[in-house]
């Protein structure tokens, strides 16, 4: 029986979500930064951990520079 990488408990077929090559419990597959529940294949991965594509993964690991969340980024109101 496979174990969930988040909670390390057994994952039964009825509650299984497969993502990143592993079987997860549906509520355990969450973005590491914001905690949003993710869907299989609908997210990004960094060092084996799931992240929502936008805004978390893009802000943390995407291109940096003007207008991209880096040091030179500005928000106008």
Swiss-Prot record:
GO terms for cellular component: cytoplasm. Keywords: Acetylation, LIM domain, Metal-binding, Methylation, Zinc. GO terms for molecular function: peptide binding; zinc ion binding. It holds the Pfam family LIM. The modification Omega-N-methylarginine is found at residue 68. The modification N6-acetyllysine is found at residues 9, 22. GO terms for biological process: cellular response to antibiotic; cellular response to UV-B; heart development; immune response; intrinsic apoptotic signaling pathway in response to DNA damage; prostate gland stromal morphogenesis; regulation of gene expression; response to zinc ion. It comes from the Eukaryota. PROSITE patterns: LIM_DOMAIN_1, LIM_DOMAIN_2. Residues 2-63 form the LIM zinc-binding domain. InterPro entries: Znf_LIM (IPR001781). CDD domains: LIM_CRIP. Seems to have a role in zinc absorption and may function as an intracellular zinc transport protein. This is Cysteine-rich protein 1. It comes from Homo sapiens.
């Amino acid at each position: 029986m496979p174990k969930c990488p988040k909670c390390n408990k057994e994952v039964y077929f009825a509650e299984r979500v497969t993502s990143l090559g592993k079987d997860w419990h549906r509520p355990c597959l969450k973005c590491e930064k914001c905690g949003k529940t993710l869907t299989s294949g609908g997210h990004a991965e960094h060092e084996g951990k799931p992240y929502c594509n936008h805004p978390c993964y893009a802000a943390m690991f995407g291109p940096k520079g003007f207008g991209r969340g880096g040091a030179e980024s500005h928000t106008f109101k």
